[in-house]
Amino acid sequence: MTDTAKPTDATKKEEPWREAVEQRLAEAPVRSSGTAQVGTGSGAQRIDYDFIAQYIPVVSDGLSAKPGEPEAAVYTLAYLAHAQGSGATSRPLLFAFNGGPGSSSVWLHLGALGPKRVHINEDGTMPAPPYAVEDNPYSWFEHFDLVFIDPPHTGYSVSASEDARKRHLSVDGDVSALAEVMRAWLARHQRFGSAVYLAGESYGTTRGAALADKMLDLGVALSGVILVSCAMDLQTLVFQAGNDLPHSLFLPGFAATAQYHGKLKGALNDAAAARVAAEAFVLEDYLVALHRGATLTAAQRSKLAKRIGELSGLPAALVEQQNLRITDQTFFTQLLRDEGRVVGRLESRVSGPMAARRGYAMEFDPGIEAIVAPYASAVNGYFAQLGIDTQRRYGIINGEVNQGWHWGRGPVDGKGKMSGNGYTNTTVDLSRALRRNPHLRVLVASGHYDLGTPYSATNYSLAQLDVDAEQLKRIEHHYYDAGHMMYTRPADLRKLKDDLAAWLARA
């Protein structure tokens, strides 16, 4: 071998990545069959299905250094109903993924959509172990064949090189990879004759909104997009100096949470009344006050602080000390501070104990802690039943993906930096998709007790879509009395399914 033919250090470094991708793509699909018990009472039905878990390659495009080579192996898990004749390949198909952005699809898979689910207590708290799956009578399998996707570096999915990893851990690179996975899956299973839907949760709505537009570039016009706990416009969610939007958009959620925990008085001690009062205050007074900023008089500041305190359950003096701007961290650690407890972020009905030395930053989110262990244990047991090798670790949540994510828009340069700037916002993509595809419909679901992606922030994001009145009619927004993963509450699991069925019937 000549010197020029010797592998470089970079090539040697990438060999384990590429070997991992090649090994996964060479594995045979895992297949099994089962019967889903869907519905309750006289409406109950049994649906026989085939289960297929397999890796789908993300193939490099013609602009990459090695066009045609797989740059990732992405794990997919599909439930395909038995059907007669042509119905087998024409049944509506739903692709689903979660967010993070470093999360696997386990939450939607075993929380709401799939034929099995993990039980969580009615009030959002953690049940006692051990954990296992149970039948899900409100599975969406009644309406669609289901395909769950784990993006690169979640679940069992991996990229083939460091350069590919950098691309995939970015807003647009992630969208391109998942679009290719869906296209390839449709081709492999000959399902281009099916109506195609997407469902995304949290950051999955960020990617879902962008995919509605991206899939059109690949010749796939979606019939519908379902957005659960929206995070399309990060400016509405990120508390940062100079960005006043979250202070106003979180207040109705703060009010709902404070009322739930018994911190509001008088007429505000009613869930609906507290939300309505906070929404009205934001529109009529708070946004104007934030706009005026330092020009407010002392009397005006005092009056505003008093009202914000009444709505949030926090002392007016604290509100004034915070310059009339309550952050999520302040709310989480202050609302129940006298009880030594911290409020949950993703499920604010849940609270957890503070350390004896009470800090001012959230040590952990009791809302998410309540579900991680049950889901992690249950999914491994369920995968073993399906014949999936659980010796390989299934990444429920990959914190390294979250930490290494590139939030700008545009291509990644050689140093892993993005050409874009500002807050990530895919409402522009969804707006364009609604203009390009006259048949695209959107269903949105928000929890009143979600302080990660508050319902009021979603209201704002939807109102900012660059569409006309007729296009806006193709969007429905429904609300639930739980948090980010509202489907962990059985009543809202059923309501979500009922809202979906009614939405589909109106098509």
Task: Give residue ranges: language-model regions.
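Catalytic histidine neighborhood in serine/cysteine hydrolases
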Residues: 467-484
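A catalytic-pocket lid/entrance helix-loop region that shapes and gates access to the active site
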Residues: 115-119, 215-312
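Short alpha-helix in the alpha/beta-hydrolase fold that links the catalytic acid
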Residues: 440, 454-464
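Alpha/beta-hydrolase fold nucleophile elbow
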Residues: 190-203
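Alpha/beta-hydrolase active-site loop
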Residues: 141-144, 151, 168-186
